[in-house]
């Protein structure tokens, strides 16, 4: 599915469980965060915003289709950039089955953070945390770089969502990571 994103990426290695990865020490707390990434970014930044890059239909890979419980290989993708004090910090995209759009309120999200909806009042369910490195091409939000990312399955009510978060170079400049 990643070839359909706004920001060109090449995944350098398959998704792996955290125990099988040598993580950069500065990114470890971000990659392994169990709570909301929105909440973490807000905690470490005075300024936080979500830039919606788009919502579109995409072809899901077999493992993506299974993780989001899609009956068809077509799914939906919501792509965003999360901004902090130093600019674009996280490229995020969420995959979900088309049925989830109608029933979960995802259609009305706009630039509201998904994390606020998922981690709202009730404890969120997360599983299938996996990590990988990506080569990201130069784009309007960051220079070309090798970046770490994670994906995990979160649930919005009964609906499984496959949430991807890539940590952009400007995040490593944050003093909280040192």
Curated annotation (Swiss-Prot):
Pathway: Cofactor biosynthesis; ubiquinone biosynthesis. Transmembrane segments: none annotated. The keyword Lipid metabolism does not apply. GO terms for biological process: pyruvate biosynthetic process; ubiquinone biosynthetic process. Disulfide bonds: none annotated. HAMAP family: UbiC. This is Probable chorismate pyruvate-lyase. It comes from Aeromonas salmonicida (strain A449).
